[in-house]
């Protein structure tokens, strides 16, 4: 009788999601290069962040063709290396656009993002939280110290009568909380800023995806200070080495973290790699 009861209880635990750790699905992270990531959640949902999949450092030149399910596309700001192929992917997959309202509006009106896939349900602003039920996740928009402009596809020099770049609202970073999985902080393009100290007041970040390239964003030394303030369990460098101006390196970042006593928090990925979280 006892053996029979144990079997029944064990089956019930698995059915109701209370089974052993090995029965749970992990969160999968894929890095395409620059600031572009794919996140597959334990529920089977798929998020893309800043989907420049054709970034030169991505070894897989068929990444867009290989995409299957995509539920949401998160874009941090309007620069081309972050919008990437978002519109093409949205038309292919039906993915909804998560972005600040100003950026969301201009991606629809200027770039042709499908209207029904970019609504108030997934548009927001700094401090707001957006539920992503298809992916079993929620995302909070946080500040990023950067710019955000959309360049129309037909842009020419303003002096020649062409369109100028269009302001696209405030740039943001995203804190992504995954049901049954980790909390990630994608910084977007940013410098270090004082309000990063507020992030650990509200979130326990498991993995911080931090830009380190410099010139347009914080460099390795400034990024190390950002990590000290955010207090993630782990940090992965991104947005470096895509072209010459992004000269910051993971080795420099590791050294700067080590000087602050937190060098063991850094993990590395190469473009095209996957990691279970």
Label every PLM stretch briefly.
Residues 2-46, 53-55, 142, 146, ...:
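Zn-dependent metallo-beta-lactamase
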Residues 24-27, 41-47, 129-140, 177-184, ...:
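Beta-strand-turn-beta hairpins that frame and shape the catalytic cleft
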Residues 32-34, 42, 68, 125, ...:
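Extracytoplasmic
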Residues 55-56, 80-84, 104-107, 126-130, ...:
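Active-site environment of divalent metal-dependent phosphoester hydrolases
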Residues 97, 109-133, 224, 228-277:
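Binuclear metal-ion centers of metallo-dependent hydrolases, dominated by the metallo-beta-lactamase
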Residues 159-228:
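Active-site-proximal loop/helix segments of hydrolase catalytic cores
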């Amino acid at each position: 009788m006892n053996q029979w009861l144990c079997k029944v209880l064990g089956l019930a635990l698995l059915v109701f999601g209370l089974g052993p750790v090995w029965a749970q699905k992990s969160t999968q992270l894929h890095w395409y290069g620059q600031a572009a990531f794919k996140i597959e959640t334990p529920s089977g949902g798929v998020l893309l962040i800043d989907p420049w999949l054709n970034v030169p450092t991505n070894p897989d030149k068929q990444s867009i063709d290989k995409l299957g399910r995509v539920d949401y596309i998160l874009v941090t700001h309007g620069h081309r290396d972050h919008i990437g192929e978002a519109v093409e992917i949205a038309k292919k997959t039906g993915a909804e656009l998560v972005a600040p309202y100003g950026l969301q509006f201009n991606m629809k009106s200027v770039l042709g993002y499908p209207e029904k896939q970019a609504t108030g349900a997934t548009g927001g602003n700094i401090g707001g939280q957006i539920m992503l039920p298809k992916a079993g996740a929620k995302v909070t928009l946080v500040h990023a110290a950067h710019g955000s402009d959309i360049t129309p596809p037909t842009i020419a020099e303003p002096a020649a009568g062409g369109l100028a770049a269009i302001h696209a609202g405030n740039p943001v970073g995203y804190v992504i909380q995954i049901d049954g999985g980790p909390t990630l902080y994608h910084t977007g393009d940013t410098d270090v800023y004082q309000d990063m100290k507020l992030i650990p007041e509200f979130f326990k970040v498991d993995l911080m995806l931090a830009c380190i390239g410099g010139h347009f964003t914080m460099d390795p030394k400034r990024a190390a200070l950002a990590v000290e303030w955010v207090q993630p369990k782990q940090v992965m460098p991104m947005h470096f080495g895509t072209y010459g101006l992004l000269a910051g390196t993971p080795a420099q970042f590791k050294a700067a973290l080590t000087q602050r006593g937190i060098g063991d928090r850094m993990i590395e990925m190469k473009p095209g790699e996957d990691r279970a979280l």
